[in-house]
Amino acid sequence: MSAARRFFVEGTQELGGVVEIGGSDARKIGRVLRLRPADRIEIVDSAATAFAASIDSIGSVVRATLL
């Protein structure tokens, strides 16, 4: 997956979990990359584990489910 669609989150995550992305990363997802719900991104947690994720909702906070 393109590095432009890779986002870093705090803490450790698990498959099936939901992550919330805010701030400038949320703006980048919604306005710069113009991604939409169901689009795929990559999430990297604090343990450097990478997950594929599907966007659930986009606003001031982006919610995505880890696949």
Q: Can you describe what each PLM-predicted range is?
A:
Residues 1-67:
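N-terminal positively charged helical leader segments and presequences
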